[in-house]
Structure formats: structure tokens, C-alpha cells
């Protein structure tokens, strides 16, 4: 499978690296902040940070997911404002990363900082059938902790 990545800024590939897998076992590629100057997020503040890239997934059989970087969330309280970003196969615009500072201190994003992770995943578009009844299961309608601790 080929993922095409287009640089939308002259900084990409020079000052800011193209997304790549850091190790042979990596599931995600890092996305970097493509900004001209540092951006500070106050505690509780949200900001859309550009990456300077667009991608082309080969077909509707694939989507790209944008996840928070674990270190930012654990160490600084900086997460994605929408939980997980979904990039559909037909989207060709710039990838933007919505960040929110849930920590108690301001957090500064520097140009080129790794701010999120991109994962390409297979997609199944099922045939949707409206049903009067659903098959019974042992679990039934139990949710929100119903299967134990």
C-alpha cells in the first residue's frame, strides 16, 4: 500500500521532517507542528496546529487516524481536542491537529515539535440493514463496566 504525502510548506523535508516510521515495529508516524513561531497553549486552551502536509490514501479501503502522543498526554496533559482524528480517503486538505492543554501549566509548541501520530488502517464499509430485533448474546445490553472491573 502506498501513502502519498504532499508538502504544503517549503519547511517540510528541510526544517520539518516528513512523517516516517521511527522504528521497524512502529505502528504510527509522527506529525510535526508546521508553524513559523512558538505557540503557547494556556491551561484549558484549544488550538488547531497545522502540519504542512496533505495525504492521499489509495482507496476507500483505508483511512488515517490521528492519535495523541503518549508523552505529551502523560507528562504535560496535552491531548487531541477531538479524541481521535479521522482522515477519510477522499480528503486532500492540510492535516491539522487540534490540541487541548488539560494540564495546569501553559504548554509551548515549538516549530517542528512532534505533536501527534498518524496511523493508516483498513476500513470496512458494511451494508447497513435496518432490523427489528438483534441476535441475543450472553452480555446483552450490559455496558459501562458490566463485564467486570
Residue ranges of predicted features:
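DUTPase catalytic domain/fold
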Residues: 1-149
Amino acid at each position: 500500500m502506498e501513502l502519498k504525502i504532499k508538502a504544503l510548506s517549503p519547511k517540510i523535508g528541510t526544517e520539518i521532517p516528513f512523517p516516517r516510521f521511527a522504528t521497524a515495529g512502529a505502528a504510527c508516524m509522527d506529525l510535526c507542528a508546521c508553524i513559523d513561531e512558538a505557540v503557547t497553549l494556556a491551561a484549558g486552551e484549544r488550538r488547531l496546529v497545522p502540519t504542512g502536509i496533505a495525504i492521499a490514501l489509495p482507496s476507500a479501503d483505508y483511512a488515517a487516524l490521528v492519535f495523541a502522543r503518549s508523552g505529551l498526554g502523560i507528562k504535560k496533559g496535552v491531548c487531541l481536542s477531538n479524541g481521535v482524528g479521522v482522515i477519510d480517503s477522499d480528503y486532500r486538505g492540510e492535516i491539522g491537529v487540534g490540541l487541548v492543554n488539560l494540564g495546569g501549566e501553559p504548554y509551548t509548541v515549538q516549530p517542528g515539535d512532534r505533536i501527534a501520530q498518524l496511523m493508516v488502517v483498513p476500513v470496512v464499509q458494511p451494508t447497513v440493514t435496518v432490523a427489528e430485533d438483534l441476535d441475543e448474546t450472553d452480555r446483552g445490553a450490559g455496558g459501562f463496566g458490566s463485564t467486570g472491573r
